[in-house]
Regions:
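Conserved catalytic cores of very large enzyme subunits
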Residues: 1-18, 25-28, 32-164
Length: 164
């Protein structure tokens, strides 16, 4: 990333010659090699995202998340996806909370590679904040919570479930 962003206009070149050609048999796992194409497509998508950034402009958490998801899309063995992701983010990160809302599977299918979880700090959670977050997660149909200290999120969650 540093080379690309701070390279002074230098083009980053990749050598794909050591990647097994498409269709080569995989002895250990079975199946056939996908060849270099999935990696090439991944790098083109990531380069497109980076080009949209002004030199030195920081990536948003969602942009970083999408880059990792594109990389996961490129991880294939025998034609089968071999990557699993979990993205942990601040519970007040609106972009990450809503990244699987709407028709994301059509506009950003790479996001399907990740389990997205909001990190909650026990001493900072209010019932109102949790309920708002819970409602947003229910609407998107995706996402979980990770309580980094204690079980306050679980306590509130149980209370919410019992009051429905």
């Amino acid at each position: 990333m540093k080379t690309y962003m701070n390279g002074g206009g230098s083009k980053v070149l990749f050598d794909y010659s050591d990647i097994r050609p498409k269709g080569a048999m995989l002895v250990t796992s079975g199946g056939k090699a996908p060849g270099p194409q999935p990696l090439k497509e991944c790098l083109v998508k990531i380069e497109g995202m980076l080009r949209e950034k002004e030199n030195g402009t920081q990536l948003t958490t969602l942009e970083a998340h999408d880059i990792v998801c594109h990389i996961a899309d490129a991880v294939l063995a025998g034609g089968i996806r071999r990557a699993a992701l979990i993205s942990l983010f601040n519970a007040d990160d609106d972009q990450m909370i809503s990244c699987k809302s709407g028709n994301w599977w059509e506009t950003n299918p790479q996001r399907g590679r990740a389990n997205n979880s909001a990190c909650l700090m026990r001493h900072k959670i209010t019932k109102e904040f949790f309920l708002d977050l819970w409602e947003r997660v229910e609407k998107s149909g995706a996402g979980f919570f990770v309580s980094s200290i204690g079980t306050r999120a679980k306590e509130i969650s149980k209370e919410v479930s019992m009051n429905k």
